[in-house]
Curated annotation (Swiss-Prot):
Family: Belongs to the RecJ family.
Compartments where found: Cytoplasm, Nucleoid
GO molecular function: DNA binding; single-stranded DNA 5'-3' DNA exonuclease activity
Residues passing through the membrane, by range: none
Gene3D superfamilies to which the protein is assigned, alphabetical: 3.10.310.30, 3.90.1640.30
Swiss-Prot/TrEMBL keywords: Coiled coil, Cytoplasm, DNA-binding, Exonuclease, Hydrolase, Nuclease
Residue ranges the UniProt entry marks as DNA-binding: 485-563
Protein name listed in UniProt: Single-stranded-DNA-specific exonuclease RecJ
A cellular-component GO term for this protein: cytoplasm
EC number(s) stated in the UniProt entry for this protein: 3.1.-.-
NCBIfam families from the UniProt entry: recJ (TIGR00644)
Subunit structure: Interacts with SSB (sbbA).
Coiled-coil segments on the chain, per record: 300-332
């Protein structure tokens, strides 16, 4: 058995709706099933989703505040006022800034941009920045991807005579800033049809309004910010992402070309993963390490030399960010382990930790421990701790932190993520309170991650063609993630570790008609918990592996499970003790039927764990449900093994079977051996077995055990009698078959057991042991005979 690490949530779609979509849209049942599950269960909604490019953008002037904003900006341009774009330091922020900068430059505006320093100024507009902007002669500020919470700063701007236009997409608070115009789809009174635009999406709509036509040349920037900011990829966001990725593949932006080249990507093959894993992390890294201005300069650059230099600088900053995150994560993990793994919520803090990457570290702690996690960087000079939090399903982080408002002067966020600032001296109190809240909120089940399953399919369903069809639903992202498929009860054909450090795993699974490769990155430990021949279920993402111009389907493993017990065949393996040592001690049950077998274990701790089974009652009473049974040596009888296993439900059985040369006869006497020995006894008349048995054995090339065994068989059958240790033939004894002897029967069964245990294949052994575990008395007798 191999337990899944996650809770698999399987929601099977309405098959009538699947059939209807399949027939009306001429798509495969696999694609139709996913559309139904994603909520596109009518032909009209599904067709629109699949053919997003045929849709139209909404009129930007449907958004509240758009006309006022456009009019004021056009007035500033016509009067040659200086306009400042006030942006944010993440990928959404820098693309928003670039979209607005490009638009205003195209309109010949006097324009510049300002992005606050994350470390000195923090997020959003600030009073000092506004005063500085005013002193530099600017009369209009346009915020992008920020500003909706800048109530105080708006008052300062008004006092200074600065006009402010806010474009944002973050949740509006109860009080909105008093400014010239607010362009925000979620503001009260806004009837814009789509509310989930990213910051760059709102900026793109303003650009559309200002230019009087759809700014196609800005779609690549809009797509990058939209995908990077993890907003839902449906409706207008899906249109932006789809058309924007097409534009990105043929972009003329020198900076983007250089950055993708440095990341090892191909601009002509760019997709949502290119943005998510290559562009976004690098654009985000700039503002995490230093001021974000170089990211904007990169996106705006029209000089190839400058673009190359900026891309190299940004790529280097990303490498620094990766090293920083790795170091901080290692330190944070060590802290968590020192604090104790019994905590229901994690709060770690350290002086010198970069506040720009604490959110990434918090996410990694959640991945590692699956607990709500807060990671704080401490500024010792100011005595404050600043950080980020990430949560798990079932724990509302924002509500929980709201209960700690008295020690959190600054915090904000939503149920799954938050940011905060507090006094460094209050960190222990925050840890204590958050753990108490989590203790009272979370159940044991909540600490098991949830894996949603989109589709249940067979091995034969995953083909190059079906994966290509599934890509009709791309680009994938929030609310339209790459589908996770479940392949149930396939046969595991092969499993092995791969990679330079053997940290990854590759499997081959099959059913009656097809086979499929499965790859799990950083899942090398799976190899130790499964054996070929097992029935395995795997949840993963479908992908195409292309090598030497040959395409093959594969499944990227997210989780795996084996519901049946497994047999690990370690007979004759030299490294068996290493394998046994690596098993979790809480599950390990080492069984021996001979006391001296324990001496063959090199590890003292393992020797102390051995359970020596010496009676059938002891074997029957041994609780092995859920255990990893390690059988060190063969049982003395089939009955003993049956009593050990019948009715039990172990998860695994490890066969070691260290052989002892005295355990079984080296040879089983043939009938001719018995004939010769009987004739010998008739001729001798009397024979002292103890005194002369070894001489006879040596003369015949037999073992002493062979002589003793044949003697006991003759005694069982009444052929001989023993007086004072001397053996003599009984005259007139009734003729009987050797198999009538209980001694002969027992040894015959033991020899058959020896053959079965030592020479059967692992598959044959497992089938046979299954009978022992499930048998009733009638089945037991049947097992004895087979």
């Amino acid at each position: 058995m191999l337990a899944s690490k996650m809770r698999w949530e399987i929601q099977r779609p309405d098959q009538d709706k699947v059939k209807s979509l399949t027939e009306q849209l001429h798509i495969t049942p696999l694609v139709a099933s996913l559309l139904v599950k994603r909520g596109f269960d009518t032909a009209e909604s599904a067709r629109l989703f699949l053919h997003t490019k045929d849709a139209d953008f909404y009129d930007p002037f449907e958004m509240k505040g758009m006309k006022e904003a456009a009019d004021r900006i056009k007035q500033a341009i016509s009067q040659q006022e200086k306009i400042m774009i006030y942006g944010d330091y993440d990928a959404d922020g820098v693309t928003s800034t670039s979209v607005m900068l490009h638009t205003l430059q195209k309109l010949s505006a006097q324009v510049d941009f300002y992005i606050p320093d994350r470390f000195k100024e923090g997020y959003g507009p600030n009073e000092q920045a506004f005063r500085s902007i005013k002193e530099r002669g600017f009369s209009l500020i346009i915020t992008v991807d920020t500003g909706i919470a800048a109530v105080h700063e708006a008052k300062v701007a008004k006092e200074l005579g600065l006009d402010v236009i806010i474009t944002d997409h973050h949740e509006p608070g109860p009080e909105l800033p008093d400014v010239r115009a607010i362009v925000h789809p979620k503001q009260p009174g806004c009837t814009y049809p789509f509310k989930e635009l990213a910051g760059v999406g709102v900026a793109f709509k303003l650009a559309h309004a200002l230019l009087g036509e759809l700014p196609d040349e800005l779609l690549d920037l809009a797509a990058i910010g939209t995908i990077a900011d993890l907003v839902p990829l449906h409706d207008e966001n899906r249109l932006i992402a789809t058309l924007g990725l097409e534009r990105l593949r043929r972009t003329n932006r020198l900076g983007l070309k250089e950055l993708i080249k440095l990341s090892g990507g191909d601009i002509g093959e760019a997709n949502e993963e290119t943005v998510g894993f290559q562009l976004a992390p690098r654009l985000n890294a700039v503002g995490r390490i230093e001021q974000a201005d170089p990211a904007v300069h990169l996106l705006m650059s029209e000089d190839s030399f400058e673009a190359e230099e900026l891309a190299a600088e940004i790529d280097q900053l990303n490498k620094e960010r990766q090293k920083m995150v790795s170091k901080m994560t290692d330190e944070a993990i060590e802290m968590v382990e020192q604090q104790g793994l019994d905590q229901t919520a994690i709060v770690v803090a350290k002086a010198g930790w970069n506040p720009g990457v604490v959110g990434i570290v918090a996410s990694k702690l959640v991945d590692r421990f699956y607990r709500p996690a807060i990671v704080l960087g401490i500024d010792e000079e100011k005595g404050i701790a600043k950080g980020s939090a990430r949560s798990i399903r079932g724990f509302n982080l924002f509500e929980s932190l709201s209960e700690c408002r008295d020690i959190l002067p600054h915090f904000g966020g939503h149920p799954m993520a938050a940011g905060m600032t507090l006094k460094a001296e209050d960190v222990p109190d925050l840890r204590s309170r958050l753990n108490e809240i989590a203790d009272n909120t979370l159940t044991e089940e909540d600490f098991i991650p949830v894996q949603e399953v989109d589709l249940v399919c067979g091995v034969e369903d995953i083909t190059v063609e079906s994966i290509a069809e599934m890509n009709m639903l791309s680009p994938f992202g929030m609310l339209n993630p790459k589908p996770h498929v479940l392949v149930e009860n396939a046969v595991l054909e092969d499993v092995r570790k791969i990679g330079a450090n053997k940290t990854h795993v590759k499997m081959t699974i099959r059913n009656e008609s097809s086979q499929l490769d499965c790859v799990g990155f950083n899942k090398g430990e799976l190899q130790e918990g499964i054996v070929p021949g097992s029935r395995i279920s795997i949840v993963g993402e479908m992908s195409i592996n292309e090598w030497n111009n040959r395409k093959k389907p594969q499944l990227m493993i997210k989780d795996a499970a084996v519901s049946e017990w497994q047999l690990f065949d370690l007979r004759g393996k030299r490294t068996w003790e290493d394998t046994v040592s690596a098993l979790p001690s809480a599950k390990r049950a080492i069984v021996s039927f001979k006391e001296d077998s324990t001496t063959l274990l090199q590890t003292e701790d393992l020797r102390r764990e051995v359970h020596v089974i010496s009676s059938k009652d002891q074997a029957k009473a041994f609780d092995l449900d859920g255990a990893y049974i390690v059988l060190l040596d063969p049982p003395p009888s089939l009955d003993m093994l049956a009593r050990l296993l019948e009715g039990k439900a172990p998860e695994r059985i490890y066969f070691i079977f260290l052989n002892h040369e005295d355990h079984f006869l080296s040879t089983f006497p043939a009938r001719d051996h018995f004939k010769w020995y009987y004739a010998f006894l008739l001729k001798r008349g009397a024979f002292d077995v103890k005194k002369h048995g070894s001489e006879l054995a040596k003369h015949k090339g037999w073992s002493v055990e062979t002589i003793n065994f044949m003697t006991k068989v003759f005694f069982d059958l009444g052929f001989v009698k023993i007086e004072n240790g001397v053996l003599s033939v009984v005259s007139g004894a009734k003729k009987r078959d050797l198999t009538d002897s209980q001694t002969y029967q027992a040894k015959q069964q033991l020899m058959e057991l020896d053959q079965k245990l030592n020479y059967s294949s692992a598959e044959e052994l497992k089938e046979w042991l299954n009978k022992l575990m499930k048998q009733d008395s009638e089945a037991y007798e049947s097992t004895r005979r087979t």
